[in-house]
Amino acid sequence: MSPIENSSSWTLESDLEDLDLDLQDYKPSVPLKKVPNGDIFEASRAGDVDRLRYLVETGVNVNARDRWDSVALYYACLAGHIDSARLLLENGAICSEHTFDGDRCHYASLNLRIRKLLKAFEARPPPLAPLQASLRDTFLGCCHNRDYLQQEEANLDVSDTLSEFGSSNYFPPDVMFYVQGRPIEAHRVILSARSPFFKQKFENEWKDRREVRFSKEKLSYPALCSLIHFFYSDRLEISVDDMEDLVRICKVCKCESLQKIIEKELIHQRYAEYKTHRDLDNSMKRFILQGISLPEEDRLPASLHRILRVSLAKSFVGDVIDSSVGDTRVGDSVESLADVCVRVDKRNFYCHQVILASRSEYFRARLSRVNDFHEGKNGLPGDTLPFLEEHDLSAEAFEKMIEYMYTDGLKEINPNQAEEIFDVASRYLLFPLKRAVADALLPHLETATPAELCQWLVLSDMYGVLKIREYCLDLVACNFEAFVETHEFRAMLLTLPPPSGDSSLRTTVPSAPGAMMTTDQGNLLDDLREKWLEAEALELDMRDESALIFDKRLAMLVEIAEREKSESEAEDYKDTSA
């Protein structure tokens, strides 16, 4: 689920109760207005949340600067638009008071409510996307990594967010670094995807090494651990005192975009020494950077997509081959650092265990069995990759599944594949994959015929794909008279449970006009009735009566559909008898 959809889960009002606020503190300095063609800066300044949400969903960088070197959050804070500020913060806008952009936002805040919002998000960063969250869980599942970061959280005097991580998140590392005698557990493919330095090392000098010991005393353990944590989570959290060490490590690891951002923040830190809060607060300060601040090609999904492309290119070489598992040699996978071979429909896919295990509980269990009992080796030589074989799905569907597992999205999809992928998402416990399929399918649905929309409505209801279900229900409700004229819509009614006639039995009770719609999946025809009442914008005192009229209309359509079905069966019987 995207951070935008999770916005309701952020409840900061309790944090504001202890503030003595005037009514004027809750009002923006300028009235809200719509800027349908505005950029992110204009939308933030105007308080146009709908336009801002659209821009964020299309991938606009929320930390981009305009020609006055200002970010969008600055304008939202300056104008007092708390909803716009909250939306930007939930999607990675920098708000730390110890950064250049965050400092400006704090000082420009129109009122205490805005400043309190910034403080709340500074103490508790927004939730990570599914890919980043899964890999972060894997990183913190390693006990040495978790112990160090828990110690850092205690030193930084922030709430404990790591206590829930334990053995259930553990997936064994394939490389261990020792810095000043202290270990960091990691996985080669993640480091290689994020850093050209690590990629070159793992392909050459460190190819067969499971432990790497750094002898340089100047190498900072906190800085290196924070950087590797960033490689997994796309979120950098580091003590301000360790930032200079991190710049040196970024230079060696060739993380140029991250290095430039940290260098700029260091300049700000040097010129911010006059700030009185440094004297008042003796606790260590931390710097937080979201991955969205980096160019898209340097973020985690793009980095893993490059690894995936190399792996898929090699899988095409083995297309529809009948050779034995013994042909999948380690040497074939050096470039992509693949460490498992998955065969689907006679095609070999070179994959990475840590990605599969982090994204799917099913693969975590399968790979754990392979590693513990050598299920995939079957007595083959030691230079062969572990081998898995998956059944009852096509190679095309598996390719789309691993594309999502590596990148958290799907660039495009054939509508004919959708049902199989929905089924695959359920079987492999990859439920967010359904949302990614829905996002890729929506452009196709814009040109779908009523008959096709009826099919999509039934399919989305069957697999619980709420986004497509809601989209189809909205279209049917707004064009109800056009749909009732189609044979496919009437035939669909025969396959669905009837609507709840008694209002006490309805899964979706008619709500007041303009009220927030429920997203819980209930009886499909009950929900269609609610959508229709909403589209008709009927007055509250007429809604129950109108709901009964709607139910009677559906009952008439069902009778027509049954008659049409009987006539069709009779004609088919005559044809077979002739």
Swiss-Prot record:
Residues 173-240, 338-414 form the BTB domain. Keywords: ANK repeat, Repeat, Ubl conjugation pathway. ANK repeats lie at residues 35-64, 68-97. GO terms for biological process: defense response to bacterium; innate immune response; protein ubiquitination; regulation of defense response. It holds the Pfam family BTB. Pathway: Protein modification; protein ubiquitination. This is BTB/POZ domain-containing protein At2g04740. It comes from Arabidopsis thaliana. The lineage of its organism: Eukaryota, Viridiplantae, Streptophyta, Embryophyta, Tracheophyta.
